[in-house]
Amino acid sequence: MKKEKMIAFSFSLFLGIITWFTLATSVRKGLPLLDASIFEYFGYAMSHGQRMYLDLFDHKGPVIFLINYLGYSIGASLGIKILYLVSLIVFFYIGYYISRLFTGIRNSFVVLVITFIIFESFFEGGWGLEGYILPCLTYSLYIFLKYFLEDKINKYEIILSGFSFAVVLFTKANMIGIWLIFSLLVTIKLIYQKQFSIFLKYIALFITGSALFIVPLCCFLWFQGSLKEMFYQSVVMNFIYSKGSGYLTVMEMIKWYMNQVNVLQLNLMIVIAMIAVWKQYGIKILFYNGAFIFCLMLALISKRAYLHYLIVLIPLFIPYISVAINKFMNKSSLLCFLIFTIGLVFIYWGPIHGIKD
């Protein structure tokens, strides 16, 4: 077990380092028109005494202000980049364990490589807020999946899931789809089984985890005098932005999304996964599909065709990819493994070449 954890971490570190070299070298020079340049300025301004929501305006939640402030305090733009790298390493590491719920060790490393390719295809030079919260999304998805597949969950896992929920909520509220849909499923399951005491216990633990982040944050904002402005800018203004008229219609957004994921063969993998596990999981796969569609709707709600908006869906792709890979690579023969791996290189030749460039 320890050896597997060490190998998984080392491979996650390797993928993180590769991502480091594909990041824009400078937010201000490399990404002048994206939000990342604004985020870096937040870090600079706050390190020079300016206050979020009072001296600085944005419709994002306070987490992105604090992350860039912390990163800038560590080492200016390099410090921000280091925090982004750490977030990605944790994301890949947890993603490995999501894959392990559905397939073996060897296949899970293949899944991580595909996950890396998908991330590189979506991240638009990096530094965006979606990358920082990937560990929270991925960890909570892992906990929910483990609970439904193995009926196992610990107190600290629920508390950490609640904490992760609060972090994402105060980053960008339309990214909390995983908690909304899976919490509903947990509620239905426990009420149907008449496990009311366990249900109340889970609620208390989840609220405790959320409060561990929300209470100190709100106290800080209150003492700073920006609590009211935070709610106005990050909730009211963000709702106006999300519901504002994007330049694409709903059908155009769906078409755009389908084009992006079809290039990466993701829809094909979803279909293969659904067929492969129907006998094993039955209606559970339909519930998972519903959760995925709900999160997709939230990601595209602004009707703006930004690839980095799709980053929050990557953790949800991992189970599909894992099942699909397991379907085709379940032979113990090393030759079969090598042949299929070479085949994947040809399938992803375009995205791989794009990463190289």
Descriptions of predicted regions:
Residues G177, L296-L298, S302-S333:
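Hydrophobic/aromatic-rich transmembrane helices and adjacent perimembrane loops
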